[in-house]
């Protein structure tokens, strides 16, 4: 397939390289010339000019949009007038599911297919095999299922159903992630405050071999402690990107109790003023899987 890729940030540049590895043709677009040049050097076409970008694709076009949720509407406003009926937009960032439903309806009126694709696995997943949760019309899904099959890990993609369902699943996934990361951080803070002198890298390693709590997150915990044995180089500030808040808000709307997720969100807010070891662990984990910045001491 020939894919038009909009957004060549940490996730977009890596998914673009994986598309090429899987023998798909890629045309990249970003306002950052250096990012465009990097993808072109890997074998893609690319430009910083949106009209030129669209001209390098032929109907029916497939656009993969991977930009921060706050600029999706601006991207759609600029690109949709350049598209033709039957073209497709796959929005693979972290948008609120209600916004995805609204955008689906807008694009449907213009005759453009619109899929909302929740993407998990961080930068490594984007580069080597991700997890996808996709919502939208089944007719559109059938066209691009091979693309998701090629770029997902084995059994790592799901057609979730109607518009919005893909990003709804990703939202809840991220809420669960908040709770899991908080529990890992709290556990290591208890270790830090105990009378024992533990090697946290070794602790994370042994817990990740055969224990009930083994996981990719525990593996990333080991990796973080390998780089900084006591996380002395970073502050315990845990930033949040919105999905945990959306999960809690949705749970309140549905009158569904989510105390673990809600408290993990509250602790992230608290970390903006109080430096804790839990915060250091969570901040380090976010940096490991998503390249999210930590605040240095």
Swiss-Prot record:
Biological process, per Gene Ontology: D-gluconate metabolic process; organic acid catabolic process; pentose-phosphate shunt
Positions with a binding annotation for substrate: 94, 120-122, 173-174, 178, 268
Binding site for NAD(+): 7-12, 94
Coiled coil: none
Keywords associated with the record: Gluconate utilization, NAD, Oxidoreductase
SMART domains in UniProt: 6PGD
Enzyme Commission no: 1.1.1.-
Active site annotation, chain numbering: 170, 177
Recorded GO MF terms: NADP binding; phosphogluconate dehydrogenase (decarboxylating) activity
SUPFAM superfamilies in UniProt: 6-phosphogluconate dehydrogenase C-terminal domain-like (SSF48179), NAD(P)-binding Rossmann-fold domains (SSF51735)
Role played: May act as NAD-dependent 6-P-gluconate dehydrogenase.
PANTHER family: 6-PHOSPHOGLUCONATE DEHYDROGENASE
Family membership: Belongs to the 6-phosphogluconate dehydrogenase family.
Protein's name according to its UniProt entry: Putative 6-phosphogluconate dehydrogenase YqeC
UniProt organism field: Bacillus subtilis (strain 168)
Lineage of the organism: Bacteria, Bacillati, Bacillota, Bacilli, Bacillales
């Amino acid at each position: 397939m020939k894919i038009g890729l909009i957004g060549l940030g940490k996730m977009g540049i890596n998914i673009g390289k994986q598309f090429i590895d899987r023998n798909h043709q890629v045309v990249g677009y970003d306002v950052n010339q250096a990012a465009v040049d990097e993808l072109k050097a890997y074998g893609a076409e690319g430009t910083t000019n949106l009209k030129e970008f669209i001209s390098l694709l032929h109907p029916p076009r497939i656009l993969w949009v991977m930009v921060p949720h706050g600029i999706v509407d601006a991207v759609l406003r600029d690109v949709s007038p350049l598209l033709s009926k039957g073209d497709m937009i796959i929005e693979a960032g972290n948008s609120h599911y209600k916004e995805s439903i609204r955008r689906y309806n807008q694009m449907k009126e213009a005759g453009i297919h619109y899929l909302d694709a929740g993407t998990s696995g961080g930068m490594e997943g984007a580069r080597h095999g991700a997890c996808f949760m996709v919502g939208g019309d089944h007719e559109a899904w059938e066209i691009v299922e091979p693309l998701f099959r090629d770029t997902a890990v084995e059994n790592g993609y799901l057609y979730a159903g109607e518009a919005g369902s893909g990003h709804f699943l990703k939202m809840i996934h991220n809420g669960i992630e908040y709770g899991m990361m908080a529990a890992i951080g709290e556990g290591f803070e208890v270790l830090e405050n105990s009378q024992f002198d533990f090697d946290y890298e070794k602790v994370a390693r042994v817990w990740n071999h055969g224990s009930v709590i083994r996981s990719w997150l525990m593996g990333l915990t080991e990796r973080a402690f390998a780089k900084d044995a006591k996380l002395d180089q970073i502050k315990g500030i845990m930033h949040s990107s919105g999905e945990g808040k959306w999960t809690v808000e949705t749970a309140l709307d549905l009158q569904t109790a989510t105390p673990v997720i809600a408290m993990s969100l509250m602790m992230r807010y608290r970390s903006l003023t109080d430096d804790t070891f839990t915060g250091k662990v969570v901040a380090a984990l976010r940096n490991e899987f998503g390249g999210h910045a930590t605040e240095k001491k």
